[in-house]
């Protein structure tokens, strides 16, 4: 799968990323390869004058490791980002709907993506599903003090929310925005409706269901790179 991630990352950058772009940079293992290749293109002079908008502290670290400058403050943001390049945990191709947030960064990922003209998703073949939610849980970022209320409300809906923890630390995982993550297993028949519905609950800041109006998916399947 690592080779697939590398190939789709290189394809996406070669075909869609141009000099002088405002570019959102997502989070995750596939984006790692995109950053490495982006670094090569910048060093060779093939890509120049990029303004990069990272979506997480992990991404900032990887960019800094490659000596790539990025926008640390968005106070001068005056135009939509041209493209955000990112990965996904699940992809429903027919609706170009996604589940994201395995890296606990989907709040900022969605802010950057939904302020971009295009969301460019890169993925290996394991991320393609027939029903959204069939492999992974849906992450929901919440205000910490709202945990008991949101948990109770979700349980009334017959869901089983699980507070995300980490074996390397005590207590729940804390996001870059100092919030908690609830992982909720569900099969999603109406991705757009589900995205809107759950955000009506007070205390829910963002849900990891993505329905960007201009999504391009570049994925590896049956021995070749495909796009839709």
Curated annotation (Swiss-Prot):
One biological process term from GO is: D-ribose metabolic process
Question: Which keywords does this chain's UniProt record carry?
Answer: Isomerase
The positions annotated for binding substrate are 27-30, 86-89, 100-103, 127
This protein's record includes keyword Disulfide bond: no
Pathway(s) where this gene product acts: Carbohydrate degradation; pentose phosphate pathway; D-ribose 5-phosphate from D-ribulose 5-phosphate (non-oxidative stage): step 1/1
Isomerase among the record's keywords?
yes
* Residues annotated as catalytic: 109 (proton acceptor)
Q: What is its EC number?
A: 5.3.1.6
Q: Which domain of life is it from?
A: Bacteria
Q: What is this enzyme's class at the first EC digit?
A: isomerase
What reaction does this enzyme carry out catalytically?
aldehydo-D-ribose 5-phosphate = D-ribulose 5-phosphate
Q: Which GO terms describe its cellular component?
A: cytosol
Q: What family is this protein classified in?
A: Belongs to the ribose 5-phosphate isomerase family.
The record's function comment reads: Catalyzes the reversible conversion of ribose-5-phosphate to ribulose 5-phosphate.
**Known NCBIfam families for this protein?**
PRK00702.1 (NF001924), rpiA (TIGR00021)
Record protein name field: Ribose-5-phosphate isomerase A
The protein's gene is named: rpiA
């Amino acid at each position: 799968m690592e080779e697939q991630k590398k190939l789709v990352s290189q394809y996406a950058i070669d075909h869609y990323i141009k000099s002088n772009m405002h570019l959102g940079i997502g989070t995750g293992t596939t984006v790692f390869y995109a950053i490495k290749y982006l670094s090569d293109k910048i060093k060779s002079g093939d890509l120049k004058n990029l303004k990069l908008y990272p979506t997480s502290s992990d991404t900032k670290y990887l960019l800094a490791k490659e000596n790539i400058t990025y926008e640390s403050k968005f106070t001068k943001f005056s135009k939509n980002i041209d493209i955000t390049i990112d990965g996904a945990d699940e992809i429903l191709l027919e609706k170009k709907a996604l589940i994201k947030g395995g890296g606990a960064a989907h709040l900022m990922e969605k802010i950057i993506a939904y302020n971009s003209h295009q969301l460019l998703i890169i993925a290996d073949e394991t991320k393609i599903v027939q029903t959204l939610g069939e492999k992974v849980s849906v992450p929901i970022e919440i205000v910490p003090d709202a945990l008991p209320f949101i948990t109770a409300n979700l349980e009334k809906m017959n869901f089983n929310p699980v507070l995300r923890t980490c074996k390397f630390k005590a207590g729940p995982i804390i996001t870059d925005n100092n919030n908690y993550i609830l992982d909720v297993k569900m099969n999603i028949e109406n991705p757009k409706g589900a995205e809107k519905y759950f955000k009506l609950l007070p205390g829910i800041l963002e849900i990891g269901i993505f329905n960007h109006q201009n999504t391009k998916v570049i994925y590896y399947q049956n021995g070749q790179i495909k796009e839709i």
